[in-house]
Amino acid sequence: MDQRQRRILGQPLSIPTSQPKQKRTSMISFFSKVSWKLRFQKREPLKNVFFILAERARDPSAKKRHMAMRNLGTMAYEAPDKVRKYKKIVLDLLVYGLYDPVNLEVIHESMKTLTVVLGKIQGKGLGSFFIDITLQTRTLLDDENDSLRYSAFVLFGQLAAFAGRKWKKFFTSQVKQTRDSLLIHLQDRNPQVAKACKTTFQACSPYLKLKEEYSFQSEEDQRNTKLYQQLSHYHPEILQFFYANKIL
């Protein structure tokens, strides 16, 4: 792989600083996705792709770490079969980003990408990653950042659908420790977070063994495992649109 190819791979482009930060970020994201599509079209050896992503996921630069998480999300959309094949490598990098010690953007991007990846693999073969993801996601349910809270509730609800027999006992203990957060954020100051919390609360109700009157279940507003598995295919931004427009 020559130097020009390496430069194409998701590195931030030189954009005039006079542009608004949000616009610069969206342009970087756009060109990053384009570069990844070109790489898949050229069938770049995956070992090279993962080697570069692994380097950037651990780079001292928060921007490069953030870009690595975003590129993994692009990969999940563009080549879900490859993600399923190399899920252990992908999950390892995403969990590493989820535990980023200093940068909330890296953590947030990791959560959003995990939501996509877990949907693609239907929660199968998570192994001990299930524990790592659950423990960290729990800590973010009460974060001051609205976007982080929203993504954390979406991901936690998804984990409830994929716990299965293997992790039922563990996840039950986690849900019980999270009960106060679930109840508090049903009245979250951000209405979109509150709706995400309500959906997650319903997903977690079986683990809490709540009585019917406290389970928020009704004929018009009933959720089940199949629905959560369907929702898991959506990116958090799409779910946010559903919530905002009262589709859910």
UniProtKB/Swiss-Prot annotation:
The record's subcellular locations are: Nucleus, Nucleolus
- Swiss-Prot/TrEMBL keywords: Nucleus
Q: In which tissues is it expressed?
A: Ubiquitous.
Chief localisation class = nucleus
Show me the HEAT repeat boundaries. 128-163
Q: Which domain of life is it from?
A: Eukaryota
A Pfam family matched by this chain, by name?
Answer: HEAT_MROH2B_C
- InterPro entries reported for this sequence: ARM-like, ARM-type_fold, HEAT_Maestro, Maestro_heat-like_prot
State the SUPFAM superfamilies in the record.
ARM repeat
Decide whether keyword Ribosomal protein is in the record.
no
What GO terms fall under cellular component here? Answer: nucleolus
Give the residue ranges for region: Disordered.
1-21
Q: What is this protein called?
A: Protein maestro
Originating organism:
Homo sapiens
